[in-house]
């Protein structure tokens, strides 16, 4: 448990705002200072469960009040980011979880936007990623899910992009958590309003996710998630609006996704994934809209399939040696068969000569 005593000093709201945030987040920072004493005490205890309970009790089930309190809590988390990054992540996660419901997002969409935006500023920090990689990944996943409730395509794509970028940064330390973030982010941007409303950021999410799933450790830990991401990222990259934002980046997504799907580890867990991804790639190679954005699209997509198939085939020398061995075996078998089929000739025995 992380002690937070003294993180909310008693000072005038405007002075606190200016010192901590330079005036950039006035409302959020002021809300952090004006938190009810019970909530301040919960934050200072360093107990995330106590913070969550305090929000629930003080809001009384009122979604707007929940959003207000969560905004203040996440602002308090950002305040202590430099001095206590681990505590900042824990507190911010509670705030984000509080606004993940549809009732809160519909009643207070602007405050939900503020909460997830501040949360993203926390989980992209290198110190947070280094000291608390799994907690950082969990915060990133929650922020994407909360953003998705707002039905704001730009917000969803922005938070998802930041989240999957953070996931890639913590990949070595927390591969299982990283692939979970990638799963959530890809599913969030796969929806049509997002692919159409924020195609460039959507493609960036797919690009980063595809890089994550080629990692062998990720494939070992969660091959089924890798298979799911591989299919989804190919579908995203082959969406005309997304593809045309950067055809070469889209081709790279397809390439990495197919490599991941073709991994023996992934195929063992999801036997149909190669067939599914192949079908998506074939459709992409025949898509006229993609060809308009990139005249060499068909060839480039076909090359992905050819390269992967070549990798899966034995080397030419090995194949030739195998063929030669097979031919030798066949020749030996034929010789044996011919020998077996020769008529048996009895040994020559000279006739006895008559005595004269």
Q: Which residues are covered by each model-predicted region?
A:
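Sec/Tat signal peptide C-region and signal peptidase I cleavage site
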Residues: 9-15
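Cleavable N-terminal signal peptides
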Residues: 2-3, 13
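Short, solvent-exposed mixed-charge patches
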Residues: 17, 353-356
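Short, low-complexity polar/charged micro-motifs in intrinsically disordered terminal tails
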Residues: 6, 351-352
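Non-catalytic all-alpha helical scaffold/repeat segments
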Residues: 16-334, 338-343, 347-348
